Amino acid sequence: KVFFKMLIHKSNIEGKLRKEKGKNLEYINEIKKKYDEWIEKINLLEKNLDEDAVKKKVEDLIEYKDFIDQPKFIKYQLDNNGWTAQSKLHSTVLEEFMYHLLKVIPSLNNGQFNLGPIKAYSNLFFAPKNLNSFIKDPGLTVNEKDQDFAISKEIIVKIGSEEKKINIPVISIENKTYLDKTMLDGSIATASKIKS
């Protein structure tokens, strides 16, 4: 399940391969072929941690992203073929790329940290049912925010008899292919909560 979350773009493609028909099935097969070529290039550079390898991975990402961002793969109002932003075909490329780019860092590869999408800890508060229950059940509540990709550490917080698992991000990344003012403000607020 964890590995599946890291290969979120591949999973998106495979889901579409199972359900699409007609022209979209033809399109998603084209994309799958190009995806496999892209991953093969990344895998050839897997052991390389130098700047040139990172640049090459980014160049390969741009080439693949340009391919799937062709107008024929994007659904417009009067067209039945292609995919909208809601299908996440285009946005999941960046999420998966973060995993491929960072998984080779030795200090992240020892099982001490998690890589991938998470519900990140943003804050906690206490909301007991009443004053009397506060002694036994302080009503520990943890707020979390979905993050597209993070390097995180799971920790357990125990207060009284309550115990909660929380994910503390060391690095948290929100991948956006389009960002309006409302989304920007939301991202800034989330970043502020996670950092504090």
Indicate residue ranges for each PLM-predicted region.
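Nuclease-adjacent, charged terminal/linker segments that flank catalytic cores
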Residues: 1-81
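Conserved catalytic cores of phosphodiester-cleaving nucleases, focusing on short active-site segments
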Residues: 149-151, 168-177, 187
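Short, conserved, surface-exposed binding loops centered on an aromatic residue
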Residues: 140-142, 162-165, 193-195
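Glycine-rich, often proline-containing surface loops adjacent to acidic residues and nearby aromatics
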Residues: 76-81, 166-174
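Surface-exposed cleft-lining segments at the edges of enzyme active sites
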Residues: 84-87, 173-179
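Acidic, metal/cofactor-coordinating or nucleic-acid-engaging core segments within structured domains
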Residues: 178-196
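Acidic-basic catalytic patches of nuclease active cores, encompassing PD-(D/E)XK
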Residues: 75-145
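Short acidic loop-to-beta-strand element that houses the catalytic metal-binding Asp/Glu
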Residues: 137-139, 144-159
